[in-house]
């Protein structure tokens, strides 16, 4: 299911114009990239505020309708008020179906409770990363990546190279030789010493 957003072209610019928009419950934003020029837009603040709470909104191709014309975009930047529950500005990037995109997608960790290091050794799993940057064509973009922790033993670490991805999805960090950790199973205190004595 694709998330849909409704927006209107924004004619007025500047701090004063944006302040007036916000006082009317509207949110200033911009769309850039793809084959088009940068376009100033305004959106319904309340609608966007609640959509931003959805995990998929941050890592999916979104359908935005500007004055009735639809475009495919990615969320690129959100500026929040320092202490109010208010979005100040939002940026979207146009997506071309024939061009690879770089997107951070969330990691969903499963089977921690049946990992031998947890179940048998009483260890604890530490999530070193909660999202990773991937590169793929828009049609291949996963909403999230599942990380299976069921094989983790005390003291073991899962790395980027251990993640199971579809064949058309790449991890730029791995292409650069950075096989970063994703999760570590921390042994219960004294566990490592006890197991080495046995």
Swiss-Prot record:
One of its GO terms (biological process) is translation. SUPFAM superfamilies: Ribosomal protein L25-like (SSF50715). Keywords: Ribonucleoprotein, Ribosomal protein, RNA-binding, rRNA-binding. GO terms for cellular component: cytosolic large ribosomal subunit. GO terms for molecular function: 5S rRNA binding; structural constituent of ribosome. Gene3D superfamilies: Ribosomal protein L25, beta domain (2.170.120.20), Ribosomal Protein L25, Chain P (2.40.240.10). This is one of the proteins that binds to the 5S RNA in the ribosome where it forms part of the central protuberance. Belongs to the bacterial ribosomal protein bL25 family. CTC subfamily. Part of the 50S ribosomal subunit; part of the 5S rRNA/L5/L18/L25 subcomplex. Contacts the 5S rRNA. Binds to the 5S rRNA independently of L5 and L18. This is Large ribosomal subunit protein bL25.
